[in-house]
């Protein structure tokens, strides 16, 4: 455990904004904040990829994580990112993409765009619930990693809360971590879902150091509602968490809010909080 107070406090309620910040004298801050574009998928569909990415950049975001390309080619995505001073370190894909016949072409397109990671985004209910299913998913990630690594990319896995449902003496997340250990496969930890599951992120970072290059930064109002909130509007102690970022190897911080009433207001509020936040 991370020096008991910081580890336990990372996902516990804060005593207020001041308690979640370090003194300004020797404080660190996030210098390159990203956003998962699923948060603004409605705008991507209605207003277009180009105008949406331009607006994202105007808010101060410098990195984006894709969840679909909305009919644009890899070259079009690459050029739009460049025009707006953005980069896209990673992309989310469904399980079926990993075993699709055109996966090598997808990897080539991802490299054209500039992605470094291809992250398995989610498992549908029929794809969960047994040791055998998670072992199969680990094997799919391992096979995909061979294809991705040949093009200079890395496979990753993005968690929700269901991976932590007990499966005898283990759980799905443990199976994925252990089965892919040493393979090059990495993990994108979602802080909201870790909070819902009641899990301590840093305990995993310590057990698998350097294996979590990306995190989803989204807040949780806390039990009993577990309502998703803009960053800084919930119970997660972000300063305590970010202070341990190097343990997990975290370098990319993606704001996300799955279904906000106003997506733009949500990611604007999250950006404002993260720009103010200081930590050690």
Language model segments and positions:
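Gly/Pro-rich active-site loop or hairpin
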Residues: 41, 52-53, 62, 164-170, ...
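Active-site acidic/histidine proton-transfer and metal-coordination neighborhood
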Residues: 63, 70, 87-89, 95-187, ...
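Conserved, mostly hydrophobic/aromatic
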Residues: 35, 56, 64, 81, ...
